[in-house]
């Protein structure tokens, strides 16, 4: 993917990732090639030999995404040099069973299939790459962040590959599974009091950085590398997967990096697209009062600097019951194990789809998996 074929802002993020300070080259070597119906028949049928399978070629239609690209070469699986090269190019699923008749089509990008298990792998890469390029993060340095968990996992995943120490501050209310994963990846995790919220965790992180010249605060709530990376990668993937045909995009807002980056790209490339931000009860994005909520990953007690209000057409508030109810429906009806923020995003997407009506298209993201919240009783309404 030559940078000028994707978008002019993508350059800093693409390229094989060498040591800090090394020049980078194209990162297109890991895009898989396609398998046509005849090839698939031969592969599955063992080239027609003993035990071959009979396959109806007419039922082998293209996947509803652009993960597979056309090629005359024999398809083969690629080998990555490190785990970070496997972030992105996630598939998109059309939610055919959950969407009611007469509503717009709804497509969900399954970001829990990133190696770190969430969409936050992308923000982590974008933030670290820019910090290296600007000289803010040097070899042997320490990455510090306040996180609900997923960004911390992404930072730890990259830190272990890049030789950085990672120190994270996580409010106690967030799931233990995520904390265990961060620690397994070598991160030092400090739990902060629930009463202090994310603002308290951020304050603790900034205090640590102030006393350590080798430490870098990732700052996902204010670092514009967060939305910029989504603009350069996630948005482009979604646009290509949908062949540029999208009428509304609906995303949960925590840092709002995913929303802001993708909405900005779509506004530039899909005229008339409607961008909808999703927040949970107790969030102040739409001017409400801060308060408690069970949904993890979205809902803020302050307005992040990474929220671009200029590309936001609407904010939909989804309460805990509707978010967790949709999580159960996604699992039981679509076979999708979504986290609670994904449940909220899909619930809001269904509202938008009903309004738009048949023939229109709504795109959303499922940021992470329900497996990350089993201790929080995600299928029983959460705790």
Residues of each region from the PLM?
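Aromatic (phenylalanine/tyrosine) cluster motif
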Residues: 13-14, 30
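Intrinsic disorder/low-complexity segments enriched in small, polar and charged residues
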Residues: 34, 40-43, 54-57
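PLP-dependent amino-acid enzyme catalytic core
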Residues: 3, 17, 25, 46-383
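Extreme N-terminal basic, low-complexity initiation segments
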Residues: 1-8, 14-16
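Basic polycationic patches enriched in arginine
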Residues: 6-9, 31, 59-61
């Amino acid at each position: 993917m030559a940078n000028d074929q994707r978008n002019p802002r993508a350059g800093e993020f693409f390229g094989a990732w060498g040591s800090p300070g090394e020049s980078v080259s194209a990162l297109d070597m890991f895009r898989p090639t396609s398998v046509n119906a005849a090839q698939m028949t031969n592969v599955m049928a063992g080239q027609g030999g003993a035990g071959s399978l009979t396959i109806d070629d007419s039922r082998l239609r293209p996947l509803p995404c652009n993960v597979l690209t056309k090629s005359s070469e024999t398809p083969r699986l690629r080998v990555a040099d490190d785990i970070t090269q496997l972030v992105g190019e996630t598939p998109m699923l059309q939610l055919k069973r959950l969407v009611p008749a007469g509503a717009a089509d709804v497509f969900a990008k399954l970001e829990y299939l990133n190696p770190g298990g969430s969409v936050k792998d992308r923000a982590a890469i974008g933030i670290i790459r820019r910090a290296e390029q600007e000289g803010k993060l040097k070899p042997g340095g320490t990455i510090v962040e306040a996180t609900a968990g997923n960004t911390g996992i992404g930072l730890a995943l990259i830190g272990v590959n890049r030789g950085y120490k990672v120190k994270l501050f996580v409010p106690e209310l967030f799931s233990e599974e995520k904390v265990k994963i961060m620690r397994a990846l070598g991160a030092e995790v400090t739990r902060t009091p629930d009463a202090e919220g994310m603002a308290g965790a951020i304050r603790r992180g900034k205090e640590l950085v102030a006393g350590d010249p080798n430490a870098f605060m990732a700052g996902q709530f204010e670092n514009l590398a967060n939305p910029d990376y989504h603009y350069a990668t996630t948005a482009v993937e979604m646009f290509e997967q949908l062949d540029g045909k999208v009428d509304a995009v609906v995303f949960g807002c925590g840092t709002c990096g995913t929303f802001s980056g993708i909405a900005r790209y779509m506004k530039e490339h899909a005229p008339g697209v409607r961008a909808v931000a999703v927040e949970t009860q107790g969030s102040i994005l739409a001017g409400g009062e801060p308060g408690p909520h069970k949904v993890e990953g979205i809902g803020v007690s302050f307005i992040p600097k990474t929220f671009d209000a200029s590309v936001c057409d609407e904010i939909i508030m989804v309460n805990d019951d509707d978010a967790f109810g949709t999580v159960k429906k996604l699992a039981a009806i679509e076979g999708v194990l979504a986290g609670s923020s994904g449940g909220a995003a899909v619930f809001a997407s269904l509202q938008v789809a009903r309004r738009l009506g048949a023939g229109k298209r709504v795109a959303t993201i499922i940021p992470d998996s329900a497996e990350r919240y089993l201790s929080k009783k995600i299928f029983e309404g959460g705790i």
